[in-house]
From Swiss-Prot:
Cofactor(s) needed for function: Zn(2+)
Annotated function: Involved in base excision repair of DNA damaged by oxidation or by mutagenic agents. Acts as a DNA glycosylase that recognizes and removes damaged bases. Has a preference for oxidized purines, such as 7,8-dihydro-8-oxoguanine (8-oxoG). Has AP (apurinic/apyrimidinic) lyase activity and introduces nicks in the DNA strand. Cleaves the DNA backbone by beta-delta elimination to generate a single-strand break at the site of the removed base with both 3'- and 5'-phosphates.
InterPro entries, per database record: DNA_glyclase/AP_lyase_DNA-bd, DNA_glyclase_Znf_dom_DNA_BS, Formamido-pyr_DNA_Glyclase, FPG_cat, MutM-like_N-ter, Ribosomal_uS13-like_H2TH, Znf_DNA_glyclase/AP_lyase, Znf_FPG/IleRS
Entry's EC annotation: 3.2.2.23, 4.2.99.18
Similarity-based family: Belongs to the FPG family.
Gene: mutM
ZnF segments: FPG-type: 236-270
Presence of the UniProt keyword Nuclease in the record: no
Residues noted as binding DNA in the record, renumbered to the chain: H89, R107, K151
Subunit: Monomer.
Cofactor note: Binds 1 zinc ion per subunit.
Record protein name field: Formamidopyrimidine-DNA glycosylase
NCBIfam families for the chain: fpg (TIGR00577), PRK01103.1 (NF002211)
First and last residue of the signal peptide: none
Length: 271
């Protein structure tokens, strides 16, 4: 599933090119996870004012309303003036005078939803309840630590839930906890101030580095300009079960936690 770094990389890869564009048409394919929420003709003539990100959602601000885009489990966006003919898994196109934005989504768990604004019930249903933005200025340690103290959930599962901090997917949760030296099964409320600060810093560091590397391409992710990500090539623990820890030489372990694969070093992450 594309996580925060992949979504941010996608945003950066086409935001400048589409800003100021006028919508000329909409192409809708097979049904996605949620319906568009308006007739496609309503969007024709609208101008794209900018592209933002909230967690794993992209927000295309229009001069009237906005489009919320979620990439689902296997989705990706492409933006270009001349795209090849639509394929069987291309389910949405926003055609503008700057180029076409196309959603490719083989499993159709993604969505493009129109809303009148962020206070629209459709937008609130998707955006409300998410935690702090880890790459934003409001990712304050005090609020983050308060969120940890209130939960008895194992820290790895709390990171994945997105209610305290948003967008930390499985690969990044494993890498963050390794960098912070915290065992994935440790209860969030048991993490004291010193370790919480290490965790807070590790979240920023890992996600920022992932964005710089273009995200992670584990199967089929690419940004809107077709570029693959490379973060997975330098992972310390994720995908390295049985291999020596890059830091101490202990074999990396693999376990199942909340139906997800968890990679950790038993020596570097003792508690």
């Amino acid at each position: 599933m594309p996580e925060l770094p992949e979504v941010e990389v996608t945003r950066r890869s086409f935001a400048g090119a589409i800003e100021g564009a006028t919508v000329r048409g909409i192409t809708v394919g097979k049904p996605l996870r949620w319906p568009l929420g308006t007739e496609p003709a309503v969007l024709v003539g609208r101008r794209v004012c900018g592209v933002r990100r909230r967690g794993k959602y992209l927000l295309l601000d229009l001069d009237e309303g906005l489009l919320l885009i979620h990439l689902g489990m296997s989705g990706s966006l492409r933006f270009a003036r001349d795209l090849p003919a639509r394929g069987a898994h291309d389910h949405f196109e926003l055609i503008t005078d700057h180029g076409t934005l196309r959603l490719h989504d083989p499993r159709r768990f993604g969505a493009v939803v129109w809303a009148a604004g962020e206070s629209d019930p459709r937008a609130r249903k998707l955006l409300d309840g998410w935690g702090l933005e880890p790459l934003g200025e409001d990712f304050a340690f005090e609020a983050f630590h308060a969120g940890l103290r209130a939960k008895r959930t194992p820290i790895k599962q709390l990171l994945l839930a997105g209610t305290v901090v948003v967008g930390v997917g499985n690969i990044y949760a494993c890498e963050v906890l390794f960098l912070a030296g915290i065992r994935p099964t440790t209860r969030a409320c048991a993490i004291g101030p010193q370790r919480a600060r290490r965790l807070h810093g590790a979240i920023r560091e890992v996600l920022a580095r992932a964005v710089e590397r273009g995200g992670s391409t584990l199967r089929d992710f690419s940004s809107a300009d077709g570029s693959a990500g490379h973060f997975q090539l330098e992972a310390n623990v994720y995908g390295r079960a049985g291999l020596q820890c890059r830091q101490c030489g202990t074999p990396v372990r693999l376990s199942r936690q909340g139906q997800r694969s968890t990679y950790f070093c038993p020596h570097c992450q003792r508690a």
